[in-house]
Amino acid sequence: LVAYVLISFFDVRPALAIGLMILAACPGGPTSNLITHLCKGDTALSVSLTAVSSILTLFTIPLILEWSVLYYSAQDTVIEINRLDIFKDLLLVSLVPIALGMLIKHYKSDFAVKMEKPVKIASALILLVLIVGLTIKERANIIPYFSEVGLSALSLNIVSLALGFTTARLMGLNKQQSISISIESGIQNGTLAIGIAIGILHNSDYAIPAAVYSLTMFLTAFVLIGLTNWKKSKISKRIFLKFQPFHIVNRL
């Protein structure tokens, strides 16, 4: 629904509109779990939401794809979506990594606790490498891609994050749970979207929004990680104590 409104607002051309709808239909994936962990959210809730949404998308993605192609490209022919291909993509990029993590946590809990800090540091470094790598790989296309769909992709990310957090808080959930729901709502699996666009629908234009989104998503993720961790850092505590009379406390 958010993607549909943004497509109308920014007047996105048909091929990119279909790509945005594909992206919006995808679940969060391991990336959303990683970002939730780095943002000190409820990681267990994030993993559960990803697992459930990944299963649900087996049914919702084909429906959204068929509707999007018919609506935005004004075609009368109904495209056939191979659910088995979607299931294979989901297994590779979402369900298998989640299952491995849950098995390690269950059978090797001491090892999982011991590795928590090193994994957190490594995860942040991997995230940085991914951003740099994507930027270098797509350096020739960054400006054209962003000029076409940059604002709509960034808006999808930010609006979904804000709606997820606000809705969770209004429902009475705590801050950790709200962070998890926010990230799960606002961080889509760009890899899966690209796989569907190119591997199943065989249209590279459909993959452009996901490619742009992958860059903007990682940038907003780093901002979120910085904000959630800055509050607990020694520097932030010193600043807070120094300027406490002028500090506006965020009670959300």
List the predicted regions and their residue ranges.
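Alpha-helical transmembrane segments of multi-pass small-molecule/ion transporters
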Residues: L1-L252
